[in-house]
A protein has these predicted regions:
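C-terminal and inter-domain tail/linker signature
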Residues: 16-305
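Sec-dependent N-terminal signal peptides
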Residues: 1-6
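C-terminal motif of bacterial Sec signal peptides marking the signal peptidase cleavage site
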Residues: 10-13
């Protein structure tokens, strides 16, 4: 073998070795997605463990010490910022409610946010409350919190509870999550800010719509009828959509409409379930009227970052 031929053979072998040692872009992409999925599951575990320890374990101080960050920004209007605010505000409620039980029904995560729906009761047989929470997690600690709370009424316009139905779904591509999130926001914008409930339903609600809001019957027609009188709203009075959390077939949306007096207004946290065509087929929510002042000085919807 000549020297040039040997050199060529050596270069070819080195090239092959380098190619085999360099991860392909698809392998790298899969690894990144897996790491992101692991982080989302870790964040969900932090939040659910915190919730269980504080509310069902009744160990409020221990939950705060273990899971809350050095900076904890509170948007629940009755509690102050910080772990101390959580312990004094929420701890007092837990202590005064010996029969308290919180059943977590749905948990979703996206980015650094974890959204949670639960059914909280104060005694056996109590209708209880629908509680929707959003937590922001940073380096394994909870650093910010928003919520919406609604009493479960005695009667409902539909045969469903505020909590039943599917609780999870297979994971979806980022493109599907982005599409469903955009559709949820467009639906709310059309219905509540533009006064176009019929258009919102025609474009974005599937032929079968299961409703868990106790004020509405099942189906798109009931929704359109209930919102038929809404006038377009702009400016400061328009409904805001501060944050969303999408996972699987579900999109969790926070809303807030100011009344114009301090921090007062009406807000909700909604869960929409979508079909494969990006149409809404199921809906859960909690709706709350918020006061004009808060214990923390924060609004119930803004972002402390």
């Amino acid at each position: 073998m000549t020297v040039p031929a040997a050199a060529a053979l050596l270069l070819t072998a080195c090239s092959n070795d380098a190619e085999s040692a360099t991860p392909s872009s698809s392998t790298t992409s899969t690894s990144v997605v897996a790491e992101q999925g692991d982080q989302l599951e870790s964040n969900k575990t932090v939040v659910t463990d915190f919730y269980e320890l504080a509310f069902n374990g009744r160990q409020v101080q221990q939950a705060a010490d273990r899971y809350l960050g050095d900076v904890y920004i509170q948007h629940n209007p009755t509690a102050a910022d910080g772990a101390a605010g959580f312990v004094s505000g929420i701890g007092g409620y837990v202590e005064a409610t010996p029969g308290l039980h919180a059943e977590i029904t749905r948990v979703f995560a996206e980015g650094d946010l974890v959204a949670l729906q639960s059914h909280t009761t104060s005694a056996p047989g109590d209708r209880g409350q629908a509680v929707f929470d959003i937590f922001r997690v940073d380096n394994g600690k909870i650093v910010e919190h928003w919520d919406a709370i609604q009493d479960v009424p005695e009667t409902s316009a539909n045969p469903n509870t505020m909590f039943d139905g599917p609780t999870s779904s297979p994971s979806k591509s980022s493109e599907v999550l982005e599409r469903n999130t955009a559709n949820a926001l467009t639906f709310l914008q059309l219905a509540f800010n533009e006064g176009k409930a019929a258009e919102a339903a025609d474009q974005l609600v599937g032929p079968t719509d299961t409703q868990h809001n106790p004020s509405f019957a099942d189906g798109k027609d009931a929704f359109v009828t209930a919102l038929a009188g809404i006038e377009p709203v702009t400016g400061d009075k328009a409904t805001k959509f501060p944050r969303t959390v999408a996972e699987g077939d579900f999109v969790f949306v926070q809303t807030f409409a100011s009344s114009g007096e301090g921090t007062a207004g009406s807000g909700s946290m909604d869960i929409f379930r979508f079909d494969e065509n990006g149409k809404i087929v199921e809906h859960w929510d909690a709706v709350q009227d918020y006061p004009s002042t808060t214990a923390s000085g924060n609004t119930v919807w803004d972002d402390g970052r």
